[in-house]
Amino acid sequence: MDKIEVRGARTHNLKNINLVIPRDKLIVVTGLSGSGKSSLAFDTLYAEGQRRYVESLSAYARQFLSLMEKPDVDHIEGLSPAISIEQKSTSHNPRSTVGTITEIHDYLRLLFARVGEPRCPDHDVPLAAQTVSQMVDNVLSQPEGKRLMLLAPIIKERKGEHTKTLENLASQGYIRARIDGEVCDLSDPPKLELQKKHTIEVVVDRFKVRDDLTQRLAESFETALELSGGTAVVADMDDPKAEELLFSANFACPICGYSMRELEPRLFSFNNPAGACPTCDGLGVQQYFDPDRVIQNPELSLAGGAIRGWDRRNFYYFQMLKSLADHYKFDVEAPWGSLSANVHKVVLYGSGKENIEFKYMNDRGDTSIRRHPFEGVLHNMERRYKETESSAVREELAKFISNRPCASCEGTRLRREARHVYVENTPLPAISDMSIGHAMEFFNNLKLAGQRAKIAEKILKEIGDRLKFLVNVGLNYLTLSRSAETLSGGEAQRIRLASQIGAGLVGVMYVLDEPSIGLHQRDNERLLGTLIHLRDLGNTVIVVEHDEDAIRAADHVIDIGPGAGVHGGEVVAEGPLEAIMAVPESLTGQYMSGKRKIEVPKKRVPANPEKVLKLTGARGNNLKDVTLTLPVGLFTCITGVSGSGKSTLINDTLFPIAQRQLNGATIAEPAPYRDIQGLEHFDKVIDIDQSPIGRTPRSNPATYTGVFTPVRELFAGVPESRARGYTPGRFSFNVRGGRCEACQGDGVIKVEMHFLPDIYVPCDQCKGKRYNRETLEIKYKGKTIHEVLDMTIEEAREFFDAVPALARKLQTLMDVGLTYIRLGQSATTLSGGEAQRVKLARELSKRGTGQTLYILDEPTTGLHFADIQQLLDVLHKLRDQGNTIVVIEHNLDVIKTADWIVDLGPEGGSGGGEILVSGTPETVAECEASHTARFLKPML
């Protein structure tokens, strides 16, 4: 079998297509957003490959695996087991890190357990158990003729007169002892002070170094070790200042006796009680009530609400503050910022042991006086948070909680013992905090000696390979300790890709969803190299991708189209790239051959130097105290290689600041910055991302864009409705009244099947129409409410042409290119790109003030060249209304049409975090240091 044959595929919008796909090749599936690429790649090929493999397992094993639905296809042959690597961002488990997902951390644990050198945390001395022979050899390696004495420590730094101990030693026949550093006779020991700490060491043997001492020394060492419980000291008799040799037969620090269990891998796992830091349980952060969150506006007074819930409207807490003010002589009406530091301390952290006279008044107006310390606002919140049973109280208080690195482990997540084990003078946390590129260099240069090199050889090979794969997919800037929650979708996908290459499987079908998301052009070549490497191992690699370089690198291209949704679902062209370019109907072919292209604008909107938004001193993550200047009213692109700090600057700094000041959001927490100026030019900030518009089948484009409300009002206004007394609520499928109660307005009923995937069957009462019979008797222009919800946007636009409010909203959905989705299509079936465009349409349809700040993060994800053209038209339209648009983007077609570019770099991770250049695309293209400039220049 050298091909995969698909016959009669009808999944979702596929129109009964037949395909022959070559095996062991790199295949790119492309086409407009919503044309059916994912339906073919994921819902047909992957689903069937996975399902057939899972069917071969026992029924018992199958119940633990989520089963894919059987795709609607007549026949597929030549499939191999399938692995899909999707865009879903990784786990939301705070314990997952880049190191644990890639399994590098597991190999590091093994490495440290097998060849690590434990040291004493206080004295930085290696802990090592030595045999008597090793001790003897060490002493004999000293210069010949040197006078030494062997001591056995009996008492270390303990108070007391110790007369009994000294008498015992003398009776055992020992002649001398060293007491507090002085050698004296045991027949006449000095009187020791009771209240002072003393150290007593018995002299076991005195000798000059020479070769024939081996036997005598061995016996002396055995005696000394037995006396002292495992430690011995060898001191120079002629030079009291010379360094002494410490020997230990225990696995312990010879100075303080600090010892630890034998090293084992679980000691280095922060997800195991044996290795996790006991203070933060291996999370690396501690939660605390943050004074900056509690006092959000220092200009307000305590009475006016500087602390939420403690102002004059809250009688109980406010009378406590008034009593406190009388005691410490401050004014509750004065702005919080003007009160002294001591008052701040007392209000937030309490009065300590100092008693204060509190006046309490009950509901009847009787006052009582009680004296007790004040616990402090933060301690009060902490106590209520711990004690409360109510989730509402806990949710309210959670708004004031911040995270800070754990004080005990300094954010390394590991307990003290594990942090003090070294491989070549480097502890595990130091390796975890290196960037992947840096770590790879470290392991390449790591030279272990002797037996340890043999033990570590295989472990080091595994670590080295995995690091290399991560570097090859462009992730050299991530650190191994980076929490998985903070990774973007593209990063998470490429990590999974790297782990797959690490697995080295052969004969598998890999299905990937746009692996180039979030990758700069510079890193794209390495990613394609990785995909070709997977293919060369002997795998079939199927990639859903719009990226020009990927399409050019493919062995076989499948172009699905010609349109999207109902207009798509057919194979427009397939074969090598030349064959695609030769087909005039193929949009992809036309863009690839240059017959169509996204034009560089003739003139750009000039920046007005008077109107700028200026953010100074941004220092989040890897940002190096940067100052961002954005011209107001322009379309700005933020560019830079992956990991250079774009998301930190815009999503973690600018957006939360603007949210707090413009939208009044209290929980948005910006990354550290100094100052921001120019927000007065805006009235609101809106972030348009690719998250789903709703997570339930009840959410749909009609409800989200607000089209559904006027539609229901139209139906309620029909004469028949008025005669029956139907209100708009009658036509909602979310409330009782008009909906079908058998399926509660879902139109489908979920049937749980064990061993098989859950199936949704159309409701047999309403036949999937969501409404009851009486509601469906009402018609507007000959259509029922169900038929209206079933229309595509295009049909609905014609149908409601005479209703201006509706026509305008539907027109905006047409403008963003969503002509093909249905009004009532469940939000869960929309792709990320589609959800984003529904949000854009909702923004466009509002009557704009022209003072909005829009933030978009990689809006071209999932978009074909033709879709990008539409998106740009919409963004330029928003800009022409006077709005300011900030887009984080790698796509050069978008970058070249921007009015202004801010380029970060020069590299990713710690090598980035600076603004290299900002200005018009023409200015930026001339910058030598910028990687973006190199790729942008030929486009202009």
From Swiss-Prot:
GO terms for molecular function: ATP binding; ATP hydrolysis activity; DNA binding; excinuclease ABC activity; identical protein binding; zinc ion binding. Keywords: ATP-binding, Cytoplasm, DNA damage, DNA excision, DNA repair, DNA-binding, Excision nuclease, Metal-binding, Nucleotide-binding, Repeat, SOS response, Zinc, Zinc-finger. A zinc finger (C4-type) spans 253-280, 740-766. Residues 310-587, 607-937 form the ABC transporter domain. It comes from the Bacteria. GO terms for biological process: DNA repair; nucleotide-excision repair; nucleotide-excision repair, DNA damage recognition; nucleotide-excision repair, preincision complex assembly; response to radiation; SOS response. Pfam families: ABC_tran, UvrA_DNA-bind, UvrA_inter. It is found in: Cytoplasm. The keyword Metal-binding applies. InterPro entries: ABC_transporter-like_ATP-bd, ABC_transporter-like_CS, ATP_grasp_subdomain_1, P-loop_NTPase, UvrA, UvrA_DNA-bd, UvrA_inter. ATP binds at residues 31-38, 640-647. GO terms for cellular component: cytosol; DNA repair complex; excinuclease repair complex. Belongs to the ABC transporter superfamily. UvrA family. Forms a heterotetramer with UvrB during the search for lesions. Interacts with TRCF (Mfd). UvrB and TRCF binding to UvrA could be mutually exclusive. HAMAP family: UvrA. The UvrABC repair system catalyzes the recognition and processing of DNA lesions. UvrA is an ATPase and a DNA-binding protein. A damage recognition complex composed of 2 UvrA and 2 UvrB subunits scans DNA for abnormalities. When the presence of a lesion has been verified by UvrB, the UvrA molecules dissociate. Binds about 2 zinc atoms/molecule. This is UvrABC system protein A. The lineage of its organism: Bacteria, Pseudomonadati, Pseudomonadota, Gammaproteobacteria, Enterobacterales.
